C-alpha cells in the first residue's frame, strides 16, 4: 500500500501487475492527523511525508467562528455549490506556472532549506543537537511552487521574498526529523523553522528589469478559456 501511494503521489500513476494507469488531472492527496491521539495508527515513513507539499496546522476556531458553526448546524443545511471546475483549476495552475521567479528568490528558498541542515553555518549552533535530519530538496522546490501560487493570489505576476517566507513553516515543519533531545527539551519543528527564517536574510528585489520585462501573464478567465 505504501509503495502504491508513493507512486501515485510522485508519478501520478498506479501500477497493478503489468498494467499502469495514469491518474486524472487535477490530482492531489490530502491526509489528516490527530495531534492528540495516535493509538492504533502507524506513522508514515519520512519518504512519504516528504511528498506532501504542505503541513497545515489547524487549531481551535475563534469564538465568532465557533458561533457561526453552531448557527449553521441549527439551520437548514445549504446545498453545496461548485466553486471552480476541474478545467478552470487546470487553467489557474497554468497561470501560476507562468508567474516569474527571480534567481535570488530561488537561492533564498534553497538557503532556508540549508539552514535546517547546517544551522551552525547560520549562527544557530544551538540547534544542531535538536535536528537529526534537515529538510530535503523538495522543500526548496515546494517553497518556490507555493510562492508562485501565493503571489498570484496576492495579485502579482512575480514572486517576492515574503511569499516564500510566509510559506516556510507549512513547507518545512513536516520535513524535519527531530532528535530525542528536542523531544526531551520540548523543542518543536515550528520553533526551529522560526529561528531558521529569522537567521536567513531575505534578498532585496528591485522592481525593475527583469521584472518589468516579463510579459503579462493571462488572467484566470483567459487561461481557462484557452485550456
Q: What residue ranges belong to the model's regions?
A:
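Canonical AAA+ ATPase core
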Residues: 4-99, 148-153
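A general structural signal marking secondary-structure boundaries and capping sites
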Residues: 12, 73, 77, 116-120, ...
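AAA+ P-loop NTPase domains with strong preference for DNA replication initiators
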Residues: 71-159
Amino acid at each position: 500500500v505504501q509503495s502504491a501511494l508513493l507512486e501515485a503521489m510522485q508519478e501520478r500513476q498506479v501500477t497493478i501487475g503489468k498494467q499502469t494507469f495514469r491518474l486524472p488531472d487535477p490530482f492531489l492527496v490530502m491526509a489528516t492527523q490527530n495531534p492528540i491521539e495516535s493509538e492504533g495508527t502507524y506513522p508514515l515513513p519520512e519518504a512519504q511525508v516528504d511528498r506532501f507539499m504542505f503541513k497545515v496546522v489547524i487549531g481551535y476556531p475563534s469564538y465568532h467562528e465557533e458561533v457561526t458553526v453552531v448557527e449553521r448546524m441549527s439551520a437548514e443545511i445549504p446545498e453545496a455549490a461548485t466553486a471552480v471546475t476541474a478545467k478552470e483549476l487546470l487553467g489557474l495552475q497554468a497561470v501560476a506556472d507562468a508567474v516569474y521567479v527571480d534567481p535570488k528568490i530561488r537561492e533564498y528558498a534553497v538557503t532556508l532549506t540549508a539552514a535546517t541542515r547546517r544551522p551552525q553555518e547560520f549562527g544557530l549552533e544551538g540547534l544542531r543537537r535538536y535536528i537529526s535530519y534537515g529538510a530535503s530538496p523538495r522543500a526548496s522546490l515546494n517553497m518556490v511552487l507555493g510562492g508562485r501560487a501565493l503571489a498570484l493570489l496576492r495579485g502579482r505576476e512575480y514572486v517576492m521574498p515574503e511569499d516564500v517566507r510566509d510559506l516556510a513553516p507549512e513547507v518545512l515543519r513536516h520535513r524535519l526529523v527531530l532528535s530525542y533531545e528536542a523531544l526531551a527539551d520540548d523543542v518543536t519543528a515550528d520553533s526551529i523553522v522560526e529561528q531558521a527564517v529569522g537567521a536567513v536574510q531575505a534578498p532585496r528585489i528591485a522592481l525593475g528589469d527583469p521584472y518589468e520585462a516579463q510579459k503579462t501573464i493571462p488572467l484566470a478567465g483567459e487561461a481557462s478559456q484557452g485550456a
